[in-house]
Design a protein with these regions (language model features):
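Helix-to-loop junction immediately C-terminal to a conserved catalytic motif
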Residues: 66
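Conserved ABC transporter NBD signature motif
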Residues: 74-85, 91-92
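Conserved ABC ATPase "signature" region
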Residues: 116, 120, 127-145, 193
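Conserved ABC ATPase signature
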Residues: 149-153
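Catalytic Walker B motif of ABC-type/P-loop ATPase nucleotide-binding domains
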Residues: 174-178
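ABC transporter nucleotide-binding domain
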Residues: 193-288
Length: 334
């Protein structure tokens, strides 16, 4: 259910507003800023992708935003409340959901009973609780497991139960920390589609993942953090424009692929100033180039001269993964 936004004094209200956030660890002689003066605002009813390599500060930031850790400095407003003043977080946490990578389970309870317990804790009772539990079991394809004890579930099944039970309560903001880890492709797509529908109904989502396809599909804004600092923050479209000087050429060859062909692409990667990177997967070679036409024509000629059958050629704009890797590379080299 969307919240009412307070626009006092014509000042825009955000679902999350973080200002000059710092988290420091260590003693006086060896202090380290794990979070180093970051600021960002997240609009209501959007998906905010929070990306970064391992150790960049993502988990620490989520722990601060969800009240597990106290910041060293900075201010945070969630749902228009300063969460570190006047006991505001106790009110705010009733309106947020959190799906972490390490869920806890009542191992001796069945899936349905444990779901009903969570519904009861969120204030649902009687038939309303049972109906909502069964609806979510159906949505996340858990109905056949309703009488199975949690301890007998696979990792992926437990993950689906964890996600389903979080949607038992009405929330305005959902923190998703790599929610698709352990899910098979069908369950993963089912979850992403359900999240998208909830966002259309007004839910705001703070989303971390290492799977860039999920970012492409869901996110309205992307924030990239590295070494505790924000290095990029914009819409996917504008980030692609910024890093869009390169194209990716995918050349798929008819197998088998001879050693001569691998040698050709290896030399191309080493000798051409127009090539940033070449990767191959089985019989497909992916060339990242700032001048695709200059690379493509001689490559196609070489393949035809050597009687190599080409199954497909595609030239693609940079992906979010390309943006992410290039932003990190530029930041690490600066």
């Amino acid at each position: 259910m969307p919240v009412e936004i307070n626009n006092n004094n014509d000042q825009k209200s955000y679902c999350i507003s973080v200002k000059n956030l710092v988290k420091t660890y260590g003693s006086a002689n060896s202090k380290k800023n794990v979070i180093d003066d970051i600021s960002f605002d997240i609009d209501y009813g959007t998906v905010f992708g929070f990306l970064g390599p391992n150790g960049a500060g993502k988990t620490t930031t989520i722990k601060i935003l969800t009240g597990i850790l106290q910041p060293t400095k900075g201010s945070i407003k969630i749902l228009d409340k300063d969460i570190f003043k006047n006991n505001n977080f106790n009110e705010v946490k009733k309106r947020i959901g959190v799906i972490t990578q390490n869920p806890s389970f009542e191992s001796n309870l069945t899936v349905e009973r444990s779901m009903e317990l969570y519904g009861f804790l969120w204030g649902l009772g009687g038939n309303k609780n049972k109906d909502k539990v069964r609806k979510l079991l159906d949505i996340f394809e858990l109905t056949s497991l309703r009488d199975t004890r949690n301890e007998d579930l696979s990792i992926g099944q437990r993950r689906r139960v964890q996600i389903a039970r979080e949607f038992l309560h009405e929330m305005d903001l959902l923190f998703l920390d790599e929610p698709t880890v352990g899910l098979d492709p069908r369950a993963r797509r089912n979850l992403l589609n359900y999240i998208k529908k909830q966002v259309e109904l007004g839910l705001t989502v703070f989303f971390t993942t290492h799977i860039m396809e999920e970012v492409e599909y869901l996110c309205d804004q992307i924030c990239i953090i590295n070494k505790g600092k924000i290095i990029e923050f914009n819409t996917p479209h504008l980030l692609k424009q910024k890093y869009g000087s390169t194209k990716k050429i995918d050349i798929t060859l008819h197998p088998p692929v001879s050693k001569n062909i691998y040698d050709y692409f290896q030399k191309l990667s080493s000798n051409s100033i127009d090539v940033e990177n070449i990767e191959n997967s089985e019989n497909t070679f992916s060339i990242t180039s700032n001048n695709p036409q200059h690379i493509l024509l001689p490559t196609v000629n070489y393949l035809y001269q050597n009687k190599i059958q080409i199954e497909n050629i595609a030239i693609n704009d940079p992906s979010i993964e390309d943006v992410f890797l290039k932003a990190l590379k530029n930041n690490n080299e600066s």
